[in-house]
Amino acid sequence: MSTTVIGSWADAGDEFSAPDITTNPDGTKTVITYRTNQDGKKVKITQKIKEVKVQERVHPLIAQRKNWKKYGKESKSPPGPDTSTTQLGEKVELKLGTSWKQQEKEEEEEKAENRAQKLSVQTIRCRTCGGDHYTSKCPFKDTLGATTSSPAAESGAGDNGPGKYVPRHLRADANGNLPSKEGRDDSTTLKVSQLNSFVDEDMLRNELFARFGPLQRVTLVRNRETGDSRGFAYVSFITEDMAQRALDALNGKGYHSLILHLEWSKKKKTV
């Protein structure tokens, strides 16, 4: 059997008769058509179609507008909007009611509850310098904590009676001194005072000290209760020479309407 190559499916459809449509007792229609598949063979296609009418209830004015006749260049266009000349907007559902005040009140209460939940979240705050780290890991515990730890040392030294427990970190040595943090080198740390209230760590790092060399840390001392700046900070460099250059260049200079005062966090021993 010889097969013919089909150049166009539209031409191939003309070789067969019109579709055979049969109406069934249940109201459906059976449509039988013949086509040629990709292999060049004649196939029979049977389709069973059921027509369903869907009624849509609309406002009488909307139904009246749909029956308006089009005019002008759109006079010959079919019913409905033409996408080439009409831009369809977003469908907006308008809900009317008398409880809008109650809805606004509920929304305000929900916002207030969310704000209260955000404020109730506890943040880490150092009791020594006010930074966002634990008090036990404060980098300036030896410098700022000396005044707060001395009363505890005195009480620990004077209350060594029977039944009194003194924590290890509050026990004084033979000379009456508290144990300090071992292995810590603050020889490259500067204390910067007389800072404006809005100055933060990033401003100190980027605007003042980054040009003198790499920084180990920049800590702005804040109020324990409010979190506001207390007007001074500690800046640690990699080497002592970098810290000395920053001290010589910035001490006594103006910065945001105030005169900076720089000094070593620990006094240098004079030889």
Swiss-Prot record:
InterPro entries (UniProt xref): eIF3_g, eIF3g_N, eIF3G_RRM, Nucleotide-bd_a/b_plait_sf, RBD_domain_sf, RRM_dom
Gene Ontology annotations of biological process type: formation of cytoplasmic translation initiation complex; translation reinitiation; translational termination
Residues annotated as domain RRM: 188-267
Gene3D superfamilies: 3.30.70.330
GO cellular component, one term: eukaryotic 48S preinitiation complex
Phosphoserine PTM sites in chain numbering: S77
Location(s), subcellular: Cytoplasm
Matches recorded under Pfam families: eIF3g, RRM_1
Keywords recorded for this protein, A-Z: Cytoplasm, Initiation factor, Phosphoprotein, Protein biosynthesis, RNA-binding
A GO MF label: translation initiation factor activity
Domain of life: Eukaryota
Matches recorded under CDD domains: eIF3G, RRM_eIF3G_like
Residues covered by region (Disordered): 1-26, 63-119, 147-187
Function: RNA-binding component of the eukaryotic translation initiation factor 3 (eIF-3) complex, which is involved in protein synthesis of a specialized repertoire of mRNAs and, together with other initiation factors, stimulates binding of mRNA and methionyl-tRNAi to the 40S ribosome. The eIF-3 complex specifically targets and initiates translation of a subset of mRNAs involved in cell proliferation. This subunit can bind 18S rRNA.
Assembly, per entry: Component of the eukaryotic translation initiation factor 3 (eIF-3) complex.
Family: Belongs to the eIF-3 subunit G family.
Record PANTHER family: EUKARYOTIC TRANSLATION INITIATION FACTOR 3 SUBUNIT G
Name of the protein this chain belongs to: Eukaryotic translation initiation factor 3 subunit G
UniProt organism field: Scheffersomyces stipitis (strain ATCC 58785 / CBS 6054 / NBRC 10063 / NRRL Y-11545)
The organism's taxonomic lineage, starting at the top: Eukaryota, Fungi, Dikarya, Ascomycota, Saccharomycotina
